[in-house]
């Protein structure tokens, strides 16, 4: 019987030349691997992607990130090689790919990147004990159910702000350069450590729910004949 690979997290982030994962291309990818206790293992990975000649960047994205097509043309890998490097990191057995808003954005960037370069866009998400997770939803869950131990900032509208840079500033977490992929990854790991330290049971419960089987198990506890409350947070 094949041994189960040890769990590790690949905390990662993209900076892109636009906000549409289907159309816009990645400019930068950064990742840090940690063990299950959030201790860093290995060296950080940071890559630039050489822009395609027929893909126009959004000027606003370049202004936000400070990453220009010229910089990526000089330092970047061809997209096929960039995609292979990203896929190899995420596909390592036992890896949980995780970021901040990664389910809605970064994972979609990865899927379209792999598809364009003739690589399986889904295998690294489930094969070999792998999975994916999103710390943004964990932060929202902690705010709603177990807010103690974390400072929750508010935006100009008076509502809770879950922007990574706001949470990092409110909690004294290092975040040297918002919209730099490696800086965003380090801030995400720091926030994960804070939530895990403050609310370990909630953290572990949310982590378990990355599995469809665990979600199905939770739902199977609900009996239609009996009134049951089911809370959805997103």
Task: Tell me what each language-model feature is.
Residues 7-8, 23-29, 33-35, 39-67, ...:
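Metal-dependent phosphoesterase core characteristic of DEDDh/y 3'-5' exonuclease domains
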Residues 16-17, 34, 65, 228:
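Ser/Thr-centric signal marking residues that sit
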Residues 18-22:
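Short N-terminal binding/cap micro-motifs at the start of the first secondary-structure element
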């Amino acid at each position: 019987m094949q041994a189960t690979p040890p769990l590790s997290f690949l905390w990662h982030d993209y900076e892109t030349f636009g906000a549409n994962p289907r159309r816009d291309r990645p400019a930068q990818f950064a990742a840090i691997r940690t063990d299950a206790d959030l201790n860093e293992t290995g060296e950080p990975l940071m890559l630039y992607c050489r822009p395609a000649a027929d893909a126009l960047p959004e000027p606003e994205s370049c202004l936000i990130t400070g990453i220009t097509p010229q910089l990526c043309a000089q330092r970047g890998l061809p997209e096929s090689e960039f995609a292979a490097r990203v896929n190899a990191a995420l596909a390592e057995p036992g890896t949980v790919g995780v970021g901040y808003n990664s389910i809605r954005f970064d994972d979609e960037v990865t899927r379209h990147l792999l598809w364009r370069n003739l690589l399986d866009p889904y295998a690294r998400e489930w094969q070999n004990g792998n999975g994916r997770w999103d710390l943004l939803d964990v932060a929202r869950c902690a705010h709603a159910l177990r807010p103690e131990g974390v400072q929750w900032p508010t935006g100009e509208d008076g509502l809770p702000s879950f922007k990574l840079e706001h949470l990092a500033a409110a909690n004294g977490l290092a975040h040297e350069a918002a919209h730099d992929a490696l800086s965003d990854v380090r801030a995400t790991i720091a926030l994960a450590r804070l939530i895990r330290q403050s609310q370990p049971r909630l953290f572990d419960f949310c982590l378990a729910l990355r599995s469809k089987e665990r979600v199905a198990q939770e739902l199977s506890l609900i009996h239609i004949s009996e009134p049951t409350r089911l809370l959805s947070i997103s």
